[in-house]
Amino acid sequence: MITVCGIFLVIPLIENTHAEDNFEKQFLFNYFYNNQNIIPNQFIIYLQDNKEESNSIDPVEFYNSELKDTGTELLYVYYNVVKGLAIKIPDEKVLEQLKNNPFVAYIGNDRKISAFIDTPTETQIIPASVDRVDGESLNNINPNFVDADIAILDTGIDLDHADLNVFHERSFIPGTINADDDHGHGTHLAGVAAAKDNSFGIVGIAPGARLWAIKVLESSGMGEISTLIKGLDYINQNQNQVDVAVLSLGCECESGALDIAINNSIKAGITIVVAAGNEGKDAGTFTPANNPEVITVSAIADTDGKCGGNGPSTPYGADDMLASFSNYGDVVDISAPGVDIYSTFKSNSYTKLTGTSMAAPHVAGAAALYKSLHPEASPNDVKSYLITSGTNLSDLCNGSGHGYFAGDKDNFHEPLLYIGTNKIN
């Protein structure tokens, strides 16, 4: 299992880490490297962005005038989701200089993140997970193509997979020439969300939706928050095209820098769907799952595509139970199947994977479907629709139809994704 790194420990100098885009000067960093998530000497800097003020400056100009001669390495420049840069500094003196710089609005540690995935388990089919949320009934809306764009910010997507409509690709991982998936995780998410309805393979929740392969994780499934923000910066550059973004990744940590980038993406009109995490803990300690503006998704085990708990049991719990690994808590908005999910994989293949990573693209596909039918819907409209149309605790199973799941670990009882035709319309 690929897990998040380390135990969260941070010394904040302000209380609110869910920062707004109009932020006062904030310093959220710990220069003492006893947190495994923190990347030593690596920081995310946001600059003042009021063009009418004298303390506004271009990020590259700022680096050249303030940092280049100090031996600081420039990693990324951000222009769209925020104005800022990611840097690697030679020593603590540079950090102290930045704290007193009038151009600087925010300083935060860069951190390691990872894909929320478990170990793989091995004519076209409708996966049981799609059946469980009644996704197969939606094929009559548009059997060949869903008019929406889904960005997968992950390990990339198999660019040549015959079952996927990869519309655009971009990699932010050094040493790669494109966003072709060298791990498999991102391709799996893409198939769950949007595999084509054709004569082979599988069918996704939003068949044939345009996929944006945004590679922000390495072949190991690991990455850095600064790289993820660069991916968010890129989709914000294309905010008039991208409808939904999937972030099935994170760490057990806080990141004000990532919160700001996500909140600005949502304000730009992009619905952000994230995985709750795979540690069996309260998701409130995980980033980006704990951001109140995103749609956070937990995972259930479902083995027969039906309610009632009559399917075979799994290593992660009985059929129709909250998966044993799934994070939970009041930050979770909705649940979806996430155990032994059969989907597309790298090298034009298919496999089963397990994790809240697999649950999130079910919800992202549903969000894309809703946007295709309601183009003017805001991210908040989409989130509200998915939550209010979901299956609730009071929806009992009749033995074969759709009903709630069991084994919720808290008293919040997030709804189970449901997207039957009568709901989506």
Positions of predicted regions on the chain:
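Sec-dependent signal peptide cleavage junction
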Residues: 9-23
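Autoinhibitory propeptides
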Residues: 22-34, 64-126
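N-terminal domain-start motif of subtilase-like serine proteases
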Residues: 23-40, 89-96, 118-152, 170-182, ...
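Structural recognition of the beta-strand scaffold that forms the well-ordered cores
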Residues: 43-45, 84-86, 106-108, 149-153, ...
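C-terminal subdomain of the subtilisin-like protease fold in secreted/lumenal serine endopeptidases
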Residues: 76, 203-209, 213, 232-234, ...
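Subtilisin-like serine protease catalytic core
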Residues: 138-169, 177-227, 240-243, 254, ...
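Extracellular S/T/G-rich loop segment that most often corresponds to the catalytic His/Ser-adjacent loop
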Residues: 154, 164, 270, 286-372, ...
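Gly/Ser-rich catalytic serine loop of serine hydrolases
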Residues: 176-190, 281, 351-363
